[in-house]
Amino acid sequence: SAFLDKRLITNDILYSNYICNLAWFSSERFSKQKIIDYILHYNSLDINDENYMTENFADTYFSRQDCSRIGFIRQDIEDEFLAGALNERERAILITSLLYAMDKIANTCGHYDAYRQGVEFDRHLELAVPTPKQNRRKNQCYNENANELVKRIQADLVYIDPPYNSRQYCDAYHLIENVARWQMPEVSGVARKPDRSALKSEYCTRQAETAFEDLIEHITARYILLSYNNMANKGNDRSNAKISDEVIMRVLEAKGTVEVFSETYKAFTTGKSNIEGNEERLFLCLSLIHISEPTRH
């Protein structure tokens, strides 16, 4: 659901997630039939031409032929958008369909830090037709640093889901981000990664607690809902939470009253560790410093 009766504001520092947010939540009108026609055309393609994807990723995360199709489709979406045949949301919907199709067949163990070598590529690219809604006209989608964005917006409820540990999302999903941006940078290493320095999150570093305190301080909302797990110091240094429970509670309680909800879950691992007692927690803060009246749209 896109919360059709509410005004929705989304933000993500990764362009790939921003594109998906545009596809699902943007208020721009789009043609369902146009989307269907493009996807039927893309799924009928039988090509094996050289392009950026074949030159850099053939027989790694995808077969050479699927790389050829991915590269052709992504370039065609851009060409059609620049020619005026697609509006911004239609472009986002088609890119989202491509990214989802890629992720469904990718030769990985759940992320793009590495690919499995010597495997048979038995699954091939097939785009599905997304079914987004015609949303409210005042929805907004952003692609920027959350700590800066919150200084300019206000809401009834702000939901925050920052990275928990030192594993940067731009590292784990570099290929998805690369195709979404389509700037065709040089890549290096076994994992074929581009330069990602501009996408690094402070929430994965020793600056996480300082960044968190700054974020909460500048939020203008009646409710703040934070998602953060209880890894603390249970795993290795890369897996451990960067923001302690003590800091979370101190910062939120300075803003208002806090209630915590939790649910157990099995953590994702590559089979090298077995960490038990994992909980996903929601920290709900009723802010004592917020806009005087809830926003009505």
PLM region spans:
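Conserved SAM/SAH-binding loop
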Residues: 144-148
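Conserved Class I SAM-dependent methyltransferase catalytic core
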Residues: 201-256
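Conserved proline-anchored active-site loop of SAM-dependent methyltransferases
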Residues: 1-2, 10-15, 151-172, 224-229
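Class I S-adenosyl-L-methionine-dependent methyltransferase module
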Residues: 7-9, 13-132, 170-205, 210
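Conserved small/polar residues in nucleotide/adenosyl-binding loops
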Residues: 289-297
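A short helix-to-beta-strand connector/capping loop
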Residues: 132-139
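Class I S-adenosyl-L-methionine
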Residues: 242-288
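A short acidic (Asp/Glu
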Residues: 2-3, 19-23, 152-155, 168-177, ...
